[in-house]
Design a protein with these regions (language model features):
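Extended beta-strand-rich architecture
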Residues: 253-255
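Solvent-exposed beta-strand/coil patches in large extracellular/periplasmic or lumenal scaffold regions
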Residues: 235-238
Length: 255
């Protein structure tokens, strides 16, 4: 049927485009992928002819990082970078580097950071297969109209345990009704009628430390520890910003 032929043609074109894009992402900017059809014994065989062309390489790497603290963190772990001058202009590696830097900053208190703050400009050098790459770090903006500022580092202020599921359904913590609480080793534990887990079990499985910088892997470790506790249906960790003096802090509510 004509519609089947059209559909096949569309799929072939899409596959060619995807393969071309994949080649270009690996640095082969002039790559051309062409579908080639053979008919053998009334059967249609489809192959793709790939002309890769010459790969583009990174001639120079520059960094446009105005935030001094972040620049220093990046310098400290520069040995782990995925980028080097002379490597192929590989878009996947450029993106992996954005993610690597983001993961590191999330260990150092940058609670609100994400990889969209990091971008690149790439200029091809005329009549060569070379590219000059600059990495940019955008400043933090609370809202679009706010003045740009340095990215903030957050410290953990208090960690609270709430052991009643209905409590966490309430998005505004001010509206939480709790009729009992205890303090164990400096951690407030709030519950409604009955405390289902021993305080020691709660604190032993916690990896988030008051007074330390926010650290994303600690949050993930806390999730996996609590996920192994049979008595819990699910775990939820929420952070609320609070300003203590001129330090940005986070209050954590676990459960």
């Amino acid at each position: 049927a004509a519609s089947d032929v059209y559909k096949r043609q569309e799929e072939t074109e899409r596959s060619s485009e995807e393969m071309t894009k994949a080649m270009q992402n690996m640095g082969y900017m002039g790559a051309v992928v062409e579908p080639v059809t053979h008919i053998k014994k009334k059967k249609l065989k489809l192959t793709y002819k790939v002309s890769s062309g010459k790969p583009y390489k990174i001639r120079s790497l520059k960094y446009d990082i105005k935030d001094e603290k972040i620049r220093e963190y990046m310098r400290q772990d520069s040995a782990d970078t995925y980028l080097t001058e002379g490597m192929y202009f590989d878009v996947n590696r450029l993106d992996a580097e954005r993610q690597r830097i983001t993961d590191n900053l999330l260990r150092y208190g940058y609670y609100k950071f994400n990889k969209e703050y990091i971008s690149y400009t790439a200029d091809t050098v005329r009549n060569t297969y070379q590219v000059d790459v600059t990495m940019h770090l955008a400043p933090f903006r609370q809202h679009n109209d706010n003045a740009p500022q340095n990215h903030r580092q957050y410290y953990i202020n208090k960690v609270n345990f709430i052991t009643d599921y209905n409590v966490l359904e309430s998005s505004a913590l001010s509206s939480i009704e709790i009729n009992a609480s205890i303090h164990y080793k400096g951690f407030p534990i709030y519950y409604k009628d009955k405390l289902y887990l021993r305080p020691k079990v709660l604190t032993n499985n916690l990896r988030i430390t008051p007074g330390s910088l926010y650290n994303e892997p600690d949050v993930q470790r806390t999730y996996s520890n609590f996920g192994r506790l049979q008595a819990l249906k699910y775990t939820n960790i929420r952070f609320f910003e609070t300003q203590v003096g001129d330090t940005s802090k986070l209050n954590a509510y676990v459960m």
